[in-house]
Design a protein with these regions (language model features):
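Short, conserved active-site entrance elements at the starts or edges of catalytic domains
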Residues: 163-216
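Amide-forming acyltransferase catalytic core, primarily the GNAT-like/NAT-type
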Residues: 1-49
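Conserved donor-binding loop and adjoining core beta-sheet/short helix segment
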Residues: 28-99, 212-240
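Short catalytic-loop micro-motif centered on adjacent basic/acidic residues
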Residues: 92-93, 158, 263-266
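Conserved active-site alpha-helix within GNAT-family acetyltransferase domains
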Residues: 100-114, 143, 270-287
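Short, glycine/charge-rich beta-strand/loop segments that flank catalytic centers
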Residues: 90-107, 119-121
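Aromatic (often tryptophan-rich) hydrophobic motifs at membrane interfaces
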Residues: 206-296
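Acyltransferase donor/substrate-recognition loop-hinge adjacent to the catalytic core
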Residues: 110-184
């Protein structure tokens, strides 16, 4: 029996000891995301045979993540399959990236059916691209930045500190009011995860920034490292009446992310056309494909998560 347990804030060191050394760049492995969304997925974890493993619920479907670690991956997968059998559920893993798919096909050939989940693909950027916006491909972005600076020459960027959490919460509440959050599917869950993250900002290991215009908050963003070379930006909110606020908070935060992080993961577009267009406009170097991987013995329709 795998000794799964609920994820808590106290598990940060245990989990990041695996994820920070890993080559996995998917946002699902961010400790902040794992904790902030646990209310929805009942996420649990365990450490077995030098691997970090996760199980969670996507609606009524039990699901797992690809194990993180080094060693006998095949043996660990067999234990996860046995765990699913004991739970009387089909064995499926969500968030399986292309390199993980290759590993599965190598060690358990012809055992899995892979279903691509484009809406959940992560957008990966070079930190240096977002921090400098150099080159012709970023001309429009530089124009946004320059226009913002000319319009609001006295703007201020400050880091998120405990005494500034409330103004972030206030902007989020106003953003939701303007964007009719209560009428859009999924925004209630997003709000709950965001509020949890802000209330547990330091315990989660988050860093972030706030943009002020005329002394008033107009944007904020935050995130944390996913692994040793990839930083995840998890949340970005701005006052849409302030032209260029989104572009400016993106630019300023990218300039504060330590240079050791080569990549920035700005997460998925959830199949939302406007969000996809915005993420593509920043010229990702990789769109990190994700798949649902289920045993061929138990084919499944695509699971939303």
């Amino acid at each position: 029996m795998i000794p799964f347990k609920d994820i808590t804030l106290a598990d940060r060191d245990t989990i990041t000891a695996f994820t920070m050394k890993s080559d996995r760049r998917n946002c699902d492995l961010s400790f902040s995301n794992l904790c902030s969304w646990r209310f929805l997925y009942d996420t649990q974890f365990a450490v077995i045979d030098d691997f970090l493993v996760f199980k969670f619920w996507a609606g009524e479907q039990l699901a797992y993540m690809m194990p993180v670690g080094n060693g006998d991956l095949k043996a660990v997968l067999r234990k996860l399959i046995e765990d699913a059998d004991k739970e009387k559920h089909n064995f499926c893993m969500l968030g399986v990236c292309s390199n993980m798919r290759a590993d599965l096909e190598a060690i358990l050939p012809e055992r899995f059916i892979f279903t691509e989940a484009r809406a959940y693909a992560d957008y990966i950027y070079l930190r240096s691209d977002l921090a400098t916006l150099k080159g012709k491909k970023f001309q429009a972005k530089r124009n946004h930045i320059n226009r913002f600076r000319n319009t609001y020459p006295d703007y201020e960027y400050t880091p998120i500190t405990p005494d500034r959490i409330q103004e972030c919460l206030d902007l989020e509440a106003e953003w939701c009011k303007v964007n009719n959050c209560d009428q859009q599917e999924g925004t209630g869950n997003e709000r709950r995860a965001l509020i949890y993250a802000l209330h547990n900002f330091e315990a989660l290991g988050l860093t972030g920034g706030i943009l002020h215009v005329n002394g008033k908050i107009v944007a904020f963003t935050f995130g944390m490292p996913i692994n040793h070379e990839t930083f995840g930006v998890h949340v970005e909110k701005a006052d849409t009446s302030i032209d260029g606020a989104y572009a400016m908070i993106n630019y300023e935060f990218a300039n504060r992310i330590p240079e050791q992080y080569i990549y920035i993961n700005r997460e998925e577009d959830l199949g939302i056309e406007g969000l996809r267009k915005a993420k593509l406009s920043y010229q990702p170097v990789t769109i990190l494909e994700k798949y649902m991987a289920c045993l061929k013995d138990h084919p499944m329709d695509m699971v939303r998560w």
